């Protein structure tokens, strides 16, 4: 089963790469390194997803958002990429933003409102793009910890900060 999931992520990654202009040799080397690291991380990610979201299915990976911000008097758009959206059997969608770190998140990072606002905006515009009730969408940070002694993956829910202030 993990091999099927890894193939799915590899295929999605290849599709995204095909959209890029890789004339720059440095960029190509960086992408190869990114792919190598992703393959090392995958075996840590799947068990954590299975633990938190039994029976999940992948809705999208690296989903691009390019939505007009209609609440402002300016002609602005939000552009971003949602790392992972999964759907669980209860009909809920879960937006996961992966963050890499060496020793976990410091208290200041956990309390950084801009980091939380990013997920709030992703949720708002994801719901608008797909016409989904915001009550059916929850947001999370997936922490990919890499240290000299061990590697681990943790998923930290941001629901308490973002759902109360939905529009």
Task: Describe each region flagged by the PLM.
Residues 57-59, 120, 135-137:
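A short, local hydrophobic-aromatic micro-motif
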Residues 1-64, 162:
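A non-catalytic, helix-rich entry segment at domain boundaries
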């Amino acid at each position: 089963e993990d091999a099927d999931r890894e193939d799915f992520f590899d295929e999605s990654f290849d599709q995204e790469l095909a959209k890029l202009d890789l004339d720059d040799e440095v960029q190509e080397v960086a992408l190869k390194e990114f792919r190598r690291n992703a393959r090392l991380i995958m075996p840590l990610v799947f068990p954590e997803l299975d633990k938190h979201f039994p029976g999940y299915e992948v809705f999208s990976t690296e989903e691009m958002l390019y939505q007009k911000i209609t609440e402002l008097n300016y002609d602005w758009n939000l552009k971003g990429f949602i790392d992972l959206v999964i759907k669980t059997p209860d009909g809920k969608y879960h937006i996961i933003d992966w963050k890499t770190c060496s020793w976990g998140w410091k208290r200041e990072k956990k309390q950084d409102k801009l980091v939380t606002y990013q997920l709030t905006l992703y949720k708002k515009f994801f719901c608008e793009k797909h016409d989904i009730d915001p009550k059916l969408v929850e947001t999370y940070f997936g922490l990919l910890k890499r240290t000299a002694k061990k590697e681990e993956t943790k998923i930290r829910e941001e629901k308490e900060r973002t759902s109360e202030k939905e529009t």
